[in-house]
Structure formats: C-alpha cells, structure tokens
Swiss-Prot record:
<dbReference type="GO" id="GO:0016301">
    <property type="term" value="F:kinase activity"/>
</dbReference>
<feature type="binding site">
    <location>
        <begin position="18"/>
        <end position="25"/>
    </location>
    <ligand>
        <name>ATP</name>
    </ligand>
</feature>
<keyword id="KW-0547">Nucleotide-binding</keyword>
<protein>
    <recommendedName>
        <fullName>Uncharacterized protein HI_1395</fullName>
    </recommendedName>
</protein>
<dbReference type="Pfam" id="PF06414">
    <property type="entry name" value="Zeta_toxin"/>
</dbReference>
<dbReference type="GO" id="GO:0005524">
    <property type="term" value="F:ATP binding"/>
</dbReference>
<dbReference type="InterPro" id="IPR027417">
    <property type="entry name" value="P-loop_NTPase"/>
</dbReference>
<dbReference type="InterPro" id="IPR010488">
    <property type="entry name" value="Zeta_toxin_domain"/>
</dbReference>
<keyword id="KW-0067">ATP-binding</keyword>
Length: 140
C-alpha cells in the first residue's frame, strides 16, 4: 500500500524501450494521463522537418535532451522512448531516480524483425516516420 502511494505522489519518469517498430509510441499513448509532458524525439523531428524528419534527428535529439533537463529541474513527470542503442538512456534513468522521480521501464520485445519492419512500413503509410531497414535489423 505504501508503494502505491509513492507512485501517486512522486513524479514519474516512464521509459519505453525496444527496437524500432516495436510499439513504444503505441504503448505510451495508453499512459498519457500519468505524465505532464511528453519527450519524443521522433515527434520533434517531424515538427522540425515534416518532409524528411531523419534530417532533423540530431536537432530533435538535442531538443529532447533539453526537455529532459527541464523536466528534471522543474520536477515534471515525463515519458521518454529509446531503442537502447546507447548508454545515455541508462544515465537518464539514473539522473531521474537521483532527482526523486519514480522510474519505470517498459520494454517492448518483438520475436521477429519482420514484424518490426511491417509495423514501420504501416506507420510510414499513415504519415509516421521512416527508419531504414538496415538500422532496424542492426538494432534488433
């Protein structure tokens, strides 16, 4: 019971991790009421360059990191997505915990890379962002 009260009282840092096309954004969409701001570098990239968001990945990543630091400093709950392809997300989890956030990790695993590729293809057809097949396979 005490643990549940902490979950309600503490700011939440919810991390959605998994390979590209695994459903991180889909899962996150079900938990929108649990956070105050959303840190989504893919969405930021789409805002910067709607025609080719991949060209804006570096700028979007910087803006996402800026939002992360803002959320930590202001004690604002947030979700963040990652493919876990680097160590920086682990450091962000530690930083959030050290700053009093309740850190929750959701890992979405898919048992075949073909499913990820099909999901990405469907996402692109509906206006979502593209990720190159070789990158998806490498991260898988």
């Amino acid at each position: 019971m005490v643990r549940k009260k902490l979950w309600v009282m503490q700011n939440k840092a919810i991390f959605y991790c998994g390979t590209n096309g695994s459903g991180k954004s889909t899962l996150r969409s079900f938990n929108q009421d649990a956070v105050q701001i959303v840190i989504d570098s893919d969405h930021i990239a789409m805002q910067i360059n709607p025609q080719n968001p991949r060209l804006a990945d570096i700028d979007a990543g910087r803006k996402a990191i800026g939002l992360f630091h803002f959320a930590i400093k202001q004690h604002i709950g947030f979700p963040m997505e990652s493919t876990l392809s680097g160590n920086s997300i682990i450091q962000r989890m530690k930083t959030a915990k050290e700053n009093g956030f309740y850190v929750h990790l959701n890992y979405i695993g898919i048992n075949r890379v073909e499913i990820n590729l099909a999901r990405i293809k469907a996402r692109v057809k509906s206006g979502g962002h593209f990720i190159a097949e070789d990158i998806v396979k490498y991260r898988y």
